[in-house]
């Protein structure tokens, strides 16, 4: 086991604080409408230019191991804020830096770190309650666009495209961000349920121009197994042919004789039919087949529950207004399922999302909710160069997370104003002893840090602005983009309550741990191993002459 280097007390805290400040100073220059860019060197390809706080934080590793521990702990603040709300990473970093700096001054002056932490926690809990009271619902498109604009560093086009996407697919719809091919941003919306499985044979195509299969008012047969024997399908095909309507078969697979017979029947016009593979794999496939069944009002034919393919009736089949199938995707539009059943299924999947532990599972479950409840929107980010594309895509993703958070918990006045107002309402809060009171004051002072940093980045005097805003009431604040004072809500400068709340809570949580640190342990650097020993002077080798 390698030898360790240990530092105690003030020596440890000073080193840790140096690391905190290096990382926070690099991140905080990005805060606000006039925040600066940070250029990140990459081991391959062009450097990345970003204004995304968490992207900057993730790149920072310091050579001094004690400093690096401090930096990594603040990095954790940014990552946690990003995971919880998807935005507010820079605000969280600025708050953590302020709490650590103020808190360690108090520790150096002889205060008890544990009581300081209790005071900080007490102030933060009270401030969070005040933020919830200040929160205003965010339901209309204009407010959503404003939140997106602020989060995308005052880029109105980003705010507008996100608001349009949310309006078209609903609050539960899935919105994804991709790199586009054009210079302008584009929005593609897929209504209905789309899954990534195309037609099993090109002979099903009936729209030659588009190269797709279009079925109007079809029956939909859902089967949880492979179909290779056509005899199993004959009763269904006969019933559908009598009804003079097309049929879509969604099964684990359709192969051999069964597929060949379907193709021949389709080409001869006996019955209009198409077949696709069921989406997903394993248990996820079973769940998605059940989703499609509920959406279309059908039943999944599965031997597990005693249903046989030969005994299928028209009542077992789902229905939809239209189905469109391309080489890669199938889309079911306007399924005939009952609304109450669909909502029940959505509620069930939402519960699974809450219980899920992995991000991948949550994402897949969220996609299923969207396919049942709304639709899927794809924002294609346009830019002139690859470097600009990466930077803009980061901003669009941040803005999207911010708008989702705003719809979830509402909005508060932006520009650091909400934290100032929350702090002013708990100024009389008292702890159990004087040291806890100092902790409360540390937290209250730290809550001014975001507005001060936004002002500094805009090139203005932070003390003047902070005092002017503190003298005001409600959503009165400072618009750093224009240099004007006024009502932040009316000016459209909004922050999602969830983002502000998460930033404060995570900053206080990690900063509290750092203030109460008394010792730090790290590996000693390994000494370089010595080279080969000199061979001169080895006994018995004197007679060896060099040529």
From Swiss-Prot:
EC assignment: 5.6.1.7
Top-level taxon: Bacteria
Keyword Ligase found: no
A cellular component term, taken from the record's GO annotations: cytoplasm
Location(s), subcellular: Cytoplasm
Classification via PROSITE patterns: CHAPERONINS_CPN60
SUPFAM superfamilies attached to this UniProt entry: GroEL apical domain-like, GroEL equatorial domain-like, GroEL-intermediate domain like
Keywords: ATP-binding, Chaperone, Cytoplasm, Isomerase, Nucleotide-binding
GO terms of molecular function: ATP binding; ATP-dependent protein folding chaperone; isomerase activity; unfolded protein binding
Subunit note: Forms a cylinder of 14 subunits composed of two heptameric rings stacked back-to-back. Interacts with the co-chaperonin GroES.
Family under the similarity heading: Belongs to the chaperonin (HSP60) family.
Protein name as it appears in the record: Chaperonin GroEL 1
Gene name of the encoded protein: groEL1
């Amino acid at each position: 086991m390698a030898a360790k280097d240990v530092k105690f007390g003030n020596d440890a805290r000073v080193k840790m604080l140096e690391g905190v400040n290096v990382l926070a100073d690099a991140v905080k220059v990005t805060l606000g409408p006039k925040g600066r860019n940070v250029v990140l060197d990459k081991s391959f390809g062009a450097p990345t230019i970003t204004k995304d706080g968490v992207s900057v934080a993730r790149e920072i590793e310091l050579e001094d191991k004690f400093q690096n521990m401090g930096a990594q702990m603040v990095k954790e603040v940014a990552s946690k804020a990003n995971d919880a709300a998807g935005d507010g990473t820079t605000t969280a970093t600025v708050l953590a830096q302020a709490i650590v700096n103020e808190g360690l001054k108090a520790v150096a002056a002889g205060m008890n770190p544990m009581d300081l932490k209790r005071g900080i926690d007490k102030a933060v809990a009270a401030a969070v309650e005040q933020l919830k009271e200040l929160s205003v619902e965010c339901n209309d498109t204009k407010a959503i666009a404003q939140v997106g604009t602020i989060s995308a560093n005052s880029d109105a086009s980003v705010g507008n495209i996100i608001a349009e996407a949310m309006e078209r697919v609903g609050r539960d719809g899935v919105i994804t961000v991709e790199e586009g091919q054009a210079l302008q941003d584009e929005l593609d919306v897929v209504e209905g349920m789309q899954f990534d499985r195309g037609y099993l044979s090109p002979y099903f195509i009936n729209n030659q121009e588009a190269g797709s299969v279009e079925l109007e008012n079809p029956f939909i047969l859902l089967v949880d197994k492979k179909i290779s024997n056509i005899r199993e399908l004959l009763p269904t095909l006969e019933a559908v042919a009598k009804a003079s309507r097309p049929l879509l078969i969604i099964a684990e697979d359709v192969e051999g004789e069964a597929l060949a017979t379907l193709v021949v029947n389709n080409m001869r016009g006996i019955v209009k039919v198409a077949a696709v593979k069921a989406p997903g794999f394993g248990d996820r496939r079973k769940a998605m087949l059940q989703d499609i069944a509920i959406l279309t009002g059908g039943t999944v034919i599965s031997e597990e529950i005693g249903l046989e393919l030969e005994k299928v009736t028209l009542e077992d089949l789902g229905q939809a207004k239209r189905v469109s199938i391309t080489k890669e995707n199938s889309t079911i539009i306007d399924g005939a399922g009952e609304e109450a059943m669909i909502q029940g299924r959505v509620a069930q999947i939402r519960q699974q999302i809450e219980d899920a532990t992995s991000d991948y599972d949550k994402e897949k479950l969220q996609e299923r909710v969207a396919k049942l409840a709304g639709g899927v929107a794809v924002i294609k980010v346009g830019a002139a160069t690859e470097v600009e594309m990466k930077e803009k895509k980061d901003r669009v993703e941040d803005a999207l997370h911010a708008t989702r958070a705003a719809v979830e918990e509402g909005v508060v006045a932006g520009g650091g104003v909400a934290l100032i107002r929350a702090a002013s309402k708990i100024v009389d809060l008292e702890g159990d002893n004087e040291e806890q009171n100092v902790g409360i004051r540390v937290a209250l002072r730290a809550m001014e840090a975001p507005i001060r940093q936004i002002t500094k980045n805009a090139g203005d005097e932070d003390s003047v602005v902070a005092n002017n805003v503190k003298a005001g009431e409600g959503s009165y604040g400072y618009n750093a983009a224009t240099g004007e004072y006024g009502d932040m809500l009316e000016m459209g400068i909004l922050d999602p309550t969830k983002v502000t709340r998460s930033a404060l809570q995570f900053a206080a949580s990690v900063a509290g741990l750092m203030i109460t640190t008394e010792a730090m342990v790290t590996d000693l650097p390994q000494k370089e191993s010595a080279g080969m020993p000199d061979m001169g002077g080895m006994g018995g080798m004197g007679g060896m002459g060099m040529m």
